[in-house]
Structure formats: structure tokens, C-alpha cells
Amino acid sequence: DAAKLAEKDLNGTARFVGMGGAMGALGGDITTMGTNPAGIGIYRSNDVMTSFSFSAYGAESKYDRETFNNDKNRWSFDNIGFVFSTKVGNETPLRYVNFGFNYKRSKSLYKNMSMAGFMGVYGDRPVSQANYMAQQATDAAKYVWDSYREPLDYSNRNIYSDNEAGWLGAIGFQGGMIEKDSKDENLYHPLNYGEPYSVFNSREQGGVGEYDFNIAFNISDRVYLGVTVGAYDVNYKKYSGYDESYDNDEGYLLDSYSKIKGSGFDIKLGAIIRPFENSSFRVGFAVHTPTFYKLTYATSARMTTDYKASTGDWDRIIVDTYDYVGDMERDYRLNTPWTFNVNMGYTVGNSLALGAEYEYEDYSTMKFKYPGNEGGGDMEFETAEAKNCLKGTHTFRLGAEYKVIPQFAFRLGYNYTSSAFKDEAVKYLPSNSIMTDTDFSNKMSQNVFTLGIGYRGSI
């Protein structure tokens, strides 16, 4: 989830998207205040801009020679902003002081996914989520016994309020999918129902909104400086349903609900230099501080188990954590990586514009912290997981715009972003985790091609 919040989509004005976002050194576009703040210094007049988009999301899953497709279409409001340009003078070193504001959809988190199939057998044991339940229950019980010399009672309805108990193990025990060892009360085993046929579905929605406030300076029409203060709003929800059914029609369904809400801020600094007086070539640099997020994670889970009783009759167990603790909430702080950006731009008259950018972020440096009322110290496990599972990313952006006439332009862009995940990265739930969704997806390297046409007139 942290990687999702730290990533940013290619989004903004139609011109910015059409050129692949490679406008850091070219400037003159409202969206550049979020990449290279100095780009607003290029403006010599006021500007107002807004954009909408229609997106078609598709997810294809393949498992056990079957293919599952999930498509979703939606309209979105992508950005709105303005620039207020103030001329200082023609002969003074400081020529313009410009102010800007822009809202954009920094990250869209809409995605649906599904897959199904037989899970197979590993060694002499069927592959099942119940194995994970039993392992977590065992790890937590042994830790509590070794630390406090007390047993962990998974049958207690207050178990979901115990900071040492993992929810996956607790709901598995209360839902009848794992049992305690007859000789060792700190050891748990999955009930052996055979190889399961599993069905998985997930729905994700929400995103991150970015509000940028900018001031930029034009010095002698050769040097442009800018600073942007960004504010962020996070609203993300996820549902996942995981079902296992067996030959005798027994089985269970685990519904997991989670959401993340919060806010954050960052500071972006940028510069653009036109090194040759008689050339339009520009080179730019930008650095973004980490985004400092204050977040709240909330979750609940519901497990429904259908089984045959010893009498031969069907019975059902329903365990709903919401009945015991409502939405369990955890407050935390997240610091995303620093961002370093180098960009170049070149124009040929008023008809052709070319841009190129390179950007680096090291996701392994992300920090998780406890909230201030809990001491504000590092969350060591989560921070270590980020270091072990994530790595630095390299992003290359290329863009071009050709104006057939002053009002009409063709645009072309390309982005490449390397994966933030190491090859061996997996989702690991510690023994006291309140998460019950065990699914995860590691985003691979990404290639994005953009094509656009634009018409710009005056009112």
C-alpha cells in the first residue's frame, strides 16, 4: 500500500499528458509546478486550465490455464489550476514573479481483479490459506507464551483487541478452519479438507489528490527558479473475497475490508537555466522532499464457514470482527522517498517543442513511524520490509509537440518506469497483524505511450 501511495500517475493538462510529462525544462504549463516548479516562471501572462478524462481500466489474470478479465470505465476530473503572472520590469534582473495553484489527481487506485482454480499440493499438504492461518496462530501463541508465560486464547471474543494476536489466525480458529494441537496448546494445525478450489475477487477504489501552491521567478529571461508546496489528500478503499471449497462441498469465504485515509505535504524546488543566450535550449533540475503523510488504516473481516456436522447435517459458522471491535483503526506516519529530476527542453521557432527527463526515487528508503501520541518512533518491522522488498526506480520521459498552425498541435510522448519491487518481494503478515487479506501484486516495469492533438484559442 505504501508503494501505491508514493507512485504518481501521468496526469494533468492535455498538453502535459500528450507530451508524456516531459515538460520540466520547457515549462509554460500549469502541471509542471508538480514536477519542476521553475516551469511556472516561463509564463508572461495569466492562465487558467482544467481537464477531464475518460479511462478504461482493464486487468487480466491467468491461472491454471484459465483467463479472467475485469474491465472498468469511469470519467474523472483530472486537474484545475491557474497562474497569475506579474511583470516586474524589462531592464531589471528580476523580470517576472508568478504565482500558481493546481489541483490534480496524483494517483488513481481503481482496479478490479479475479481468478480461480485448484491450488495444488505442496509436499504432502494441500496449498490452502488455512496453512497461513495456522502458522500465524502458532507464531503469536508461542511469542506470548515465551514473553509472558500466558496462553493466547483464540476462542475469546476479545481476541481482536489483543495487540499480540493476529487476526488471520484468530478468525481461522473461530471459523473452524484450524485447530489446537492435542499435546501442545501453542501449536495449531489446519483442518485437512483436501485440495481446495479457490475463487478470489478484489475491488479497489479511490486515489490521491494533490494541491500545489507555487511561486516562480524569471531572472533576465535566462534563469528561472520556483518552489511548490504540495498538500495531499488520501482516500483509498479495498475489498477482497477469498473462497475455498472442497470435494465434500465444505468450505469457507473470507471477506476483508480495508481503507486508508489521511493527508500529507511536501516541498518541491526547481530551476531552469538557458545557458546560451542565442539558443532556446534549456536544462532544468528539481528535487522533491518526501511526502510526509499522516494516515489512518481501518479494517474489518467476516468469515463464513459451511461444514457437515457429526450428525450429517449442514451447519454454518459466521465470524464478523465488526461485531466485536467495529472498524479497527491504526494511525501511522509514512515518509515517501526523495525525488530527483533532471530535464532538458528545446524549441524550434514557435512550431516544434522537444522535452526529455530523467527521475530517480529510492522506494527502499521509505519510513514508517508511530503517531506522535505513541512516541513518534520508527515502526521497525514495516520500515525493514520496505528496505527488503523495494528498490530505486528510474523514470525516463520523452515528449514532442508540433504546431501545424499556431492554434493546432500534434503531441507525442513516451514514459518508461522501472519496477519498485525486488524480484523476491512478497507480502508478509507478522504474527500480530490485523490484516486478513493475503493477496498482493508487484507492479512490473511500465511503458506508456501517449498521443494527442490540441487546439488553443483565446477568449
Regions of interest found by a model, annotated:
Residues 1-11, 16, 85-459:
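Outer-membrane beta-barrel porins/channels
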Residues 14, 26-35, 41-120, 206-209:
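Outer-membrane beta-barrel translocator/receptor signature
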